[in-house]
A protein has these predicted regions:
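Short acidic alpha-helical/loop segments enriched in Asp/Glu that coordinate divalent cations
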Residues: 84-95, 114
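Sequence-level motif detector for i,i+2 pairs with an aromatic at +2
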Residues: 1, 7-9, 91, 96-98, ...
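Catalytic core of non-heme Fe(II) oxygenases with the double-stranded beta-helix
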Residues: 95-124
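Non-heme Fe(II)/2-oxoglutarate
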Residues: 1-88, 109
């Protein structure tokens, strides 16, 4: 585990620790979601845009049973991060607003954006 202080921003980096079988199952589920949304023939943001589940109706992965173990791990890391930067996690009410997968293939990209409504964001 490592904390990187970058100006006023602290970045927490760690391995989540999913076993390979579960990781492969989750990846397949993400591809299934992508394929399911292919019924919408129009790419939301252009031909070179990556697939982002949030704009295709898959913005609540944390509510899906298949992703429960992943989010249990993420929760532990969030609490660890908050403790490490000096906050009492018992005084904070943690909750997920949204969570989604992305699929980026060669020459595809995700447009610049921010998560201004969130105090913490993570990527896995």
């Amino acid at each position: 585990m490592e904390i990187i202080n970058l100006f006023p921003l602290s970045i927490y980096r760690s391995k989540v620790g999913l076993d390979d079988a579960l990781r492969k199952t989750l990846i397949q589920e993400i591809y299934n979601q992508e394929n399911e949304s292919k019924n919408n023939k129009t790419k939301m943001y252009g031909e070179r845009s990556s697939w982002t589940g949030d704009v295709y109706g898959h913005e609540y992965l944390y509510k899906e049973k298949k992703f429960e173990v992943l989010f249990d791990h993420i929760e532990k890391h969030i609490i660890n991060y908050v403790k490490k930067i000096g906050y009492n996690e018992e005084k904070i009410d943690f909750y997920y607003q949204r969570s989604w997968a992305t699929v980026s293939r060669k020459n595809e990209y995700i447009k610049y954006h921010n998560h201004s409504q969130s105090h913490l964001s993570f990527a896995y």
